[in-house]
Amino acid sequence: MTFRMSDLSDLARKRVAVAAYYFVPGLVFASWASRIPDVKHLLHLNNGQLGSILLAIPLGQLLMMGFSGVLVSKLGSKKMLVVAEVFYAAVLLAMGCSSTVFHLTLSLVGFGMMANLMNIATNTQACLVEKLYGCNIMSSFHGLWSLGGFAGGIVGAVFANTVLPIEAHFGTVLALSLLILAAGFHFLVNDEQARAEEEDVPKFSFRTIDPVLFLLGLMGFAGMFCEGTVYDWSGVYFTSVVKPDEVFIRAGYVAGMGAMTLGRFLADGFVTRYGAARVLKVCGLLILCGLLLATLLPYLVTATLGFLLVGFGISSSVPICYSIAGKLGTVKASIAITIVSSISFFGFLVGPPVIGWLAEVSGLRMAISIAACLGLMIAFVATKVSKRISIDTDSRANAF
C-alpha cells in the first residue's frame, strides 16, 4: 500500500488534536489539585470535611457511568468530547468561585460527571486514531495527560505564590484550555467513518457480552487500585515507615509519577514489538516486585526504587486494556471502553480506602504488600487472555 504525504499529514493532525484533548484535562485536574490547600483554608474546612467534600468527584463519575457510553455511541465521540472538555474546564472556574461548601460540592459533582463523559469520549477518539495509524499509540495519549498534569502543577505553584486570587488562576487555565480545544476541534476524527465500520458489530446485550471485556476491566481495576495507592499513600508510607529526611518525603511519589509518565511514552513501542499480552505480564510483575521491594526493604533508596518500578508497571496497564477493548469488535468501541473503564475506575475509587482499612488492622507495610498481589493478578489474567488479544496487537507499523 502506498501512502501519500497528504495522508500522513492528515493523520498527524488528528493525532496531535487528540493528544491536545488529553493534555487539557491533565492541565485542568492538576490546576484544581494544586489549589486544594488554598480552598480548604478559604472555606475553613478541617481534614474530615475536606475528605467528605472530595468524594463528590467520584460521586459525579458514578452518576454519569450509565449514560456516558450511550451518549458517545448515539451522538458521537467528537461532539461529546468537545462538550465534556469545555464544561470540565468551565466547572474548574466555578469551583474557584465557590464561596460556600454547598456550591463547591455541587461543582465537584459536575466536575466528576464531565470527567466520566470525557474519559469515554477521549479514549474512543484515541481508538479511532489508533485504527487509522494501524499501530499502537494509545499509551502515548495517556502520557499527554500526565504531561498536562505536570504543566498544571507548575502553573498552580506559580499562581499560589502570587497575590492573585484562585479565580484568576482558574480563569487563566479556562481561557488557555478553550484556545487549545478550539485549535484541535477541526482535526478530531469524524464519527461517521466509525459508524460505517461498526454497522456489522452486534448490538450490545448483557447476555452476549464478551467475557474478555470483564477480564480487561479486572486488569484495569488492579492497575488503577495500585495507581490510587501511589497517589494517596506513597507520601504517608515514606513519612511513617521509611522516615527519611523531610526533603525526601515525596521521593516515592515523584519516582512513581515520573516513571508512569515516561512509561506511557515508551509503552507503545514495546506493545508493537512484543505484543500487548507480554507487556501486560511485565507490567503486573513490575507492580508485584516494586511493592514487595518497597515494603520488605523500607529504606530510602530501596523504597524509592520500588515505587519507581510500580510507576512503570501502572503506566501502561490501563491504556493497553482500553486499546484492546476498542479493537475487539464484539460491541461498539464506545460501549467496550465504557465497560472496561467503569470496572477499572472502581479500583481507583476503592483502592486508597481499602489500603487505609487494612493499615488499621495490620499496619501500612502489610497493607501495601497485600496490594502487590494485584500485580500478580494482572500477569495471570494477561496470560489467560493472551491468545485472544494477540490478534489485535501484532501491527508492526511505525508511528510518526
PLM regions with names:
Residues H44, G76, C97-F102, G275, ...:
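Helix-breaking motifs and short loop linkers at transmembrane-helix boundaries and internal kinks
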Residues H103, S140-V189:
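Helix-loop-helix hairpin linking two adjacent transmembrane segments in secondary transporters
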Residues K79-L93, R278-L293:
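Structural signature of the two symmetry-related core transmembrane helices
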Residues M64-S77, A160, G263-A276, A359-E360:
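Helix-to-loop junctions at the C-terminal end of transmembrane segments
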Residues V39-K40, L71-V72, V158-V163, F238-T239, ...:
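Interfacial helix-cap and linker-helix signal at transmembrane-aqueous boundaries
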Residues L63-F102:
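Conserved MFS/SLC helix-loop-helix module at the cytosolic interface between two early adjacent transmembrane helices
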Residues S34-G48, D232-F248:
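Short amphipathic helix-loop junctions that connect adjacent transmembrane helices
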Residues L108-L144:
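Cytoplasmic helix-loop-helix junction between adjacent transmembrane helices
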